[in-house]
Each structure stands twice: as C-alpha cells, then as structure tokens.
C-alpha cells in the first residue's frame, strides 16, 4: 500500500489537561467533525469513543492513552489521548515522548489547575510545541482573559490569543478571529454551521488591542515582518499564519483559542490551528539515539528512505487480539510479516499484523511509514520503551525514564484456585505499565503490588476482576520506606571456615559514609581504594556484590538503603582457601557491621502536594496539613481560592481524598507526586520498625 498522506501533512499530537478540563469531549468532537464518528459520545453519560476501558467509562476519566487517526483538510492527524490524573503521569510522559506537538486544554472557570502544571512541565522537558484551548466557555464563571493570565503567570508561558470569545457563560455564541478580524457566530446546536460576520461593535476595541499584541509578538520572531510592522504596512493572512507557525514550533509562543467542546463550538478552528501551527515530523529535530555497537550518539531523519527505527511506547492487552504494542515509526518503513530487531533487548522480532487504531476500532494495514503511530501484533519480547530497528542498521533511541512506585499493598486472591491466574494477570499488567510492580515478600509470602497512588492500585484490582476474572482482596497500603546513615564508620568483615579439606577465607575492611549530595546519585556508590593487592583484583567485584546485596535489606527494618558511599579500604587473602563466595559473605558482614556503627536512620517518601481550596476552608486545610506532619512551602491566593504547596509524608496521606472532601464539602482538590526521601522522626521510626520486625 503506497503512502496515503505525505510527511509534511502528518501531525502527531497529544491532548493534555487537568482531570476535568474536558479532554475526552474535545477529542470526541475532533473525531466527529473530521468524519470518524457518526454519533457523538459523551463522558457525561459514559459513552465516549476514546475512553474504551470499562473503568474509564464508569469513572469518567481517561486512563490509558488510546491512539486515534483522523483526517482534516487533506492532513492526517494522529491523536494520543492522555490521562489527566496525577496517578497516571507515566502515561503522559510516555505519550509526550512520541508526539511532535500538543494541545493543552484549560477549563475557562479555573484556568491553570494543579495537574495542568505537572503536565506542562513534562512537555517542557521534552520540548513539545503547544497550542492552548480554553474550553467550557459556556460554563458559569467562565473567564477567558483570567485563564490566559493564569497560563502566563503560573506556567510562565508566552500565551498569545489568536481568538477572543463573543460572550461567555450561556451567552457564549462564537469567537473573533484575530487573524482575519472577522466574527464566527455559531448557528446550530451541533456547531457544524457558523456564519462569518463583522465584529460586534462592543468588541472592536478589545479585538484591536489583542490583534496588536499578536502582531508585536510574531514580529519579534521574524525580521522581515518586524520591518513591515514598524513601517505600518498591512500583514497578509499568510504572513501572519506562517510567523505564528514558526514561533510555535520554536516554543517561543503558545497560540490560545477558545470554545465549548460540549456545546460543539470552536472545534473546527482548533482543527485548523493543529494543521496550521503544529509541527509535521519533518519540522522537529531528528530523533537522537545511540549505536549499540560503538556506543556513539547517532540520529535518524524523519524519512521513508532512512533505515527503519521505531519506539514501542505502550503495551496493551486486547481481549481479542492479545498483546498490542503501540509504536511510533520515526524513520523508514515496516511491513507486516517482516522481521525487525529489538535493539534494547538484543532480540529478533516478527511483525505479525499492523493496525491503524481508531479509539477501540481497528483497521489492518500492510505497511507503516515514517511518522505513523500504529499498533503492532506479534511482538513477543518487546516492552514499553523498547526500540525496534533494521537488523543491519542498529540504533537504540533514547529511553524513557519512569519514576519508582511509592505505595504498596498486599493482595491475595479470594480463592486459592485463582492464585496462579492472579500471578499471570499481574505479570501482564506490569508489562503494560512500568510504574506498576509486583513481587513476593519473602518473609511473609504475600504477593505485593506497588504503584503511583491509591487510585492507580484501585484500577489495577478492578482490571484483575474485569479482564482476568480474578477476585482479589487487598490489605492496608504500605509505604516504601528506605534506610540510610548519618555518619561515617569503618568495620571489618571476616569470613573464615577451615575445618579439614578446602576451607573458605574472605577478609575486607569497609568504610561507609553518607553522600554529600544524594540528589545526584542513584542510591549507593562503591569505591575500591585498595593499593598493593591486599585483595586480588578478581575478588573485588565479589566484595562489592556482597555489600550491595546487604544494602537491599537495611539493619533497622530490612528496607533498602540509599544515599551512601561504600569504600573498600583493606583486606587479606589466603592462597588456597579464598573464593568469590567467601569475599561476598565478608563484604556483606563488613557492610552490616559498619552500618550498625554509622547511626542508621529510617527514611520515608515525602510527597509534593498541591491543594486548591476555597478561602473559607483555608484554616481547616492548613491545620490538617500540620496534623499530618506536613510543611507548607508556599501559598498563592487566586479568585476566591488559595493554592497551597506542601510536603507531606506519604504515610500520612492515606484516605486524604475522603478527609479533604468532608472538610471542604467536596470543594477542594489536590494532586500529589513523589518528591524526595526524608528522615522519619524517632518516635514514629521506632513504631514502624517495631511493626515490621514483629511480623
């Protein structure tokens, strides 16, 4: 099958937003107007096309980013729908990694909300160009200009309106296009018909002010336009659009549009803006990678002629076809039935079938081209973040980084017969989601599942029941504690066993000390400071392995140890009896003895929590933060509400959603994410260790 749409007419975009800004509704309307759906589905009644998991339809939130293809004015738009709940930030990171541009949605009543900031920062990290769409202009309290101000203030973004609304709340009837300086007035309920009219007289002055601001902004990024603008010449529509496109792709500005997706107003201009201002795959820098043979950096151009390279950014299990690998093709082409190389795993894979996804409907194609986002069936060893490439032109594209889980619960099947089934199901879910882990606690024999928050684990348990028919009970949440030390200490580890026949002999002296700046480390550093061969070279890795293994179970409560440096200072050996095993045991003994002298402490995860509360509940909310051992880091009043930034230990956050709702009659919201580890106060530390050791 020949390429249907050229690369320059392809757009890979995401839609990112806070949990309730109307993201799924906007996607629905885009699919409706671009002719993919004949009846509009609504999140309000649980029938949206993109929210295809049952849990999503019940909760009215989007959990997995479904990939959808649609066409608009001869362009192909691939849309990745991303979740807005903070427990699912991994899905957002994952989709931003494979997008070329994004539409950031905001709720016109509240402007920037906590999760909008998190998602915006993630998009900054990947340098994704964005246009802003201020949705829900028909809602009570909608305020377009306030929303634009919050984008500028809280996100420090150069948000520049290219439309302004005509009316607001129930009087919202259309928009003024600042490029053409005409008014688009919507005539029918479905928003498919609108008339282009002169700007209403009461809006002319405001429109002229914002148009001048737009022209000044784009002139800054285009010398030719700057000259014309300063000389008072009229700029053509084409020139303005070209300049907006250049500035947007360079991340120098964010065009702002508005509408009400629910009331079908403003969606077609948004589609036009996606085509006009979002980059095609050829407009973004070449994808970076590493040549696995030489470890040298390399790049791949977005072109069908280049060797094949693609990134599997999401694995999903489909009830009918099994494992789907959602994949972004960066360069080259790939055909169904062909063999490719998974360079991350070093394994050959066969491409079974290639599907173009439309929410949960699918169309089979026989070939995928550069710039396409497709689902591949038949990959056995491929997991999230793996690179697929040509056998004879290897590359590993930069991998994605995923945060470690912060909350764990014990889980057991309701019937013993389901034990094996549960194990298989959990393994499948862990394959789909790198922030979800499952393991067996060796001391208690319990199966433990870990994730990014209570909602994340609730949904996992839900999916066990629905997709795998496994009923499970879960225990109380457990916090991922860690241990560390507060001072330097030295100790000897000596393992000698000589009772006839070949004995064992390992002897080492280790120093442990806290790291100066733990933020830059990955937990534990090992340094060999032995000179003069006190321990033969071949045994040093064994000492390191013994010490690092011992660091996995600290001496206070058996939690993994963090933020410390281990130095091998000295040792001795025996010509006959020394062995790798003996040095491994000696390394472990020396480490534990040194840690015992180094004033060990317990660490707990501290969460960065952002709480948005109406002013009248501020005192109660602050008091509650203090009672949870929280520290308030900043306060930001805005329009009758206060936004509090706080650091609160995760151990104190269980059930917080319910408490906050009852304290504020459901009017406050919060979001949290892991920030750092900090020392647990002594009284609590003793209680935690006591509980752990009495198990």
Curated annotation (Swiss-Prot):
Pfam families from the UniProt entry: EF-G_D2, EFG_C, EFG_III, EFG_IV, GTP_EFTU
GO cellular component labels: cytoplasm
Annotated keywords: Cytoplasm, Elongation factor, GTP-binding, Nucleotide-binding, Protein biosynthesis
Segments of this protein annotated with the region Disordered: 285-304
A Gene Ontology biological process term: ribosome disassembly
Disulfide bonds: none
GO MF assignments: GTP binding; GTPase activity; translation elongation factor activity
Compartments, as annotated in UniProt: Cytoplasm
Binding site for GTP: 17-24, 81-85, 135-138
Record bears the keyword GTP-binding: yes
Transmembrane parts of this sequence: none
SUPFAM superfamilies: EF-G C-terminal domain-like, P-loop containing nucleoside triphosphate hydrolases, Ribosomal protein S5 domain 2-like, Translation proteins
Family annotation (NCBIfam families): EF-G, PRK12740.1-3, PRK12740.1-5, small_GTP
Protein name as annotated: Elongation factor G
Organism expressing this protein natively: Finegoldia magna (strain ATCC 29328 / DSM 20472 / WAL 2508) (Peptostreptococcus magnus)
